[in-house]
Design a protein with these regions (language model features):
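C-terminal structural segment of proteins
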Residues: 1-240
Length: 240
């Protein structure tokens, strides 16, 4: 297998045109290749500046998870810190987790940040939503978002080898008219749900609104965790 490491977007597009298969931190991809055979040509984005940035409102797809620190919002930092072991976080990448892994541990955090994805198309990079990236498995260059007012993250304990643990991510944003909106994303099993509700009226009213969305159909235990997380993030705002 020949591995190329482009340092510009143009070089990366040339690699794509030649049929190069992206390789990064998704260990499941390596396992598949070991079983089925390695591709003739692969490419890594770790030499591409657009894919290696760690900034307050952007994160590159080739960033390994252990590099995600307090430069990014709390919800994303805590999501990255909860993935696997230290050894896993030193090799797993943002793009590998979101596109190459069935668990997609970072997806709830990215959804509540209302993150937009920059992907590498055949002609030029373009921006799209996370749903398209996950569904079509695009070559991800990075994520961008607006800094939230507050954010939170909770991952329930789980037994090794069992089903994926419940994840609840939250973030409060200010819309164009100055109103506060709460975004909540839940990973239940392999499914991820995301909903939004106004939150200026307080936790109780916000929870009532969320119960009328698809989140209201979650199992009772998952709804309890959602309620706790909503109370945690909105409680300090009560009375403001």
């Amino acid at each position: 297998m020949l591995l190329r490491q482009p340092t510009t977007v143009t070089e990366a597009q040339e690699c794509m045109a030649q049929g190069a298969v992206p390789v990064g931190g998704a260990t499941l991809v390596w396992a598949t290749w070991q079983r089925d055979g390695f591709p003739d040509l692969a490419m890594s984005l770790r030499g591409l500046p657009e894919a290696t940035a760690v900034e307050p409102e952007s994160l590159g797809a080739a960033v390994v998870l252990h590099r995600i620190d307090d430069r990014v919002p709390e919800v994303l930092r805590r999501a990255a810190g909860s993935v696997g072991t230290g050894a896993v976080r030193r090799t797993a990448t943002v793009g590998g987790n979101l596109v190459g892994s069935s668990l997609r541990c970072l997806l709830p955090a990215a959804l509540v940040l209302d993150a937009r994805a920059t992907v590498l198309g055949p002609d030029q990079p373009y921006e799209t939503d996370l749903a398209e990236v996950v569904a079509k498995r695009h070559l991800l260059l990075g994520l961008r978002w607006r800094t939230p007012v507050a954010s939170g993250y909770r991952k329930q304990p789980a037994e090794a080898g069992g089903p994926p643990p419940l994840v609840v991510a939250t973030a409060v944003h200010v819309d164009g008219e100055g109103r506060h909106r709460l975004r909540v994303a839940v990973r239940e099993g392999y499914d991820v749900l995301s909903e939004t509700a106004g939150c200026d009226a307080g936790p109780d009213e916000t929870l009532d609104a969320l119960e009328r969305t698809d989140l209201g159909a979650l199992p009772a235990g998952a709804r309890d965790v959602v309620r706790e997380q909503v109370a945690d993030i909105l409680g300090p705002r009560a009375g403001r």
